[in-house]
Structure formats: C-alpha cells, structure tokens
C-alpha cells in the first residue's frame, strides 16, 4: 500500500500546480496502477531493482510527465512563467502539450542513458560492477561492512 501511495505522489509531482483535483486523482490512480504492473513485470523477468526504485520512480515519473501534458488546465499554466507551454496549450491544446512532453521524456531518457553509461564505465574500470557469487551468497552487508543487516535468528 505504501508503494502505491509513493507511486501516486511520484506521478502527481510533474503536474503539481497544473491540474485540478479530479485530474490529480486520476493521475494518481493511473500512475499507481501502471507502477504496480511495472513491479509485476520486473519480478517476472527477474530484473534486479532494489526497492522497486525504477518501477515506481522511473515509470511513475514518466507516466506523470506524460499525463501532465494531457490533463494540464490552461488556466493553471501562467504565460509569464511558462510561455512556451502556455503558447502550445493555446495553439495546439493538450494534445500539443502531450507531444511536447513525449519529446521531453525521450530527451531525458537519452540524457540519462548516456550519463549512466559513462558512470558505469568509470565504476567498472575503477572498482568493478559485480561482486563474486560467493560474496553475494554470503551477503553484501557482511562482506562489505562486516556485519549483518538483520539477525539471522529472527528470519
């Protein structure tokens, strides 16, 4: 339940201040359902995503950004602060803003992919990206920090 609430909050973050309450609720419901589906898919393909970080924040933020374009209320997008968005809403409506948000999301993913590739290359060259199977089986808390995160007797 807490993950669903976080997913809803992640989804509404891009739209905060640009949608009315019914649209905010809709964004929260759609985002939570989509993130739940992403968590299920992640588990079925055995994708290593601790705490469902990408399934909730990556997917939730993407859905929220896209739904902001579809559901933004023109009256809540001040032309003084967001002239391009206000202009798009005025000339092309929410569909035009949705297309602009798709472009922004694609550009963001591209930027993040390049940055991640650079970081992975550096980390891989300096310390390596994986631990041995034996270390992973023993537990990284013990191997890397010399202590257990949880008392094995309570599990």
Regions found by a protein language model. Give the residues of each.
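Glycine- and aromatic-enriched membrane alpha-helices
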Residues: 1-155
């Amino acid at each position: 339940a807490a993950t669903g609430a976080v997913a809803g909050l992640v989804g509404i973050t891009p739209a905060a201040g640009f949608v009315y309450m019914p649209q905010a609720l809709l964004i929260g419901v759609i985002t939570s359902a989509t993130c739940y589906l992403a968590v299920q898919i992640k588990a079925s393909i055995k994708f290593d995503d601790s705490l469902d970080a990408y399934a909730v924040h990556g997917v939730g933020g993407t859905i929220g950004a896209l739904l902001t374009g579809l559901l933004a209320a023109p009256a809540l997008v001040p032309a003084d602060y967001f002239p391009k968005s206000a202009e798009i809403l005025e000339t092309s409506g929410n569909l035009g803003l949705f297309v602009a948000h798709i472009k922004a999301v694609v550009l963001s993913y591209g930027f993040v992919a390049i940055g991640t590739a650079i970081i992975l290359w550096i980390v891989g060259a300096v310390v390596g990206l994986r631990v041995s199977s034996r270390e992973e089986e023993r537990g990284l808390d013990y191997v890397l920090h010399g202590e257990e995160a949880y008392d094995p007797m309570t599990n």
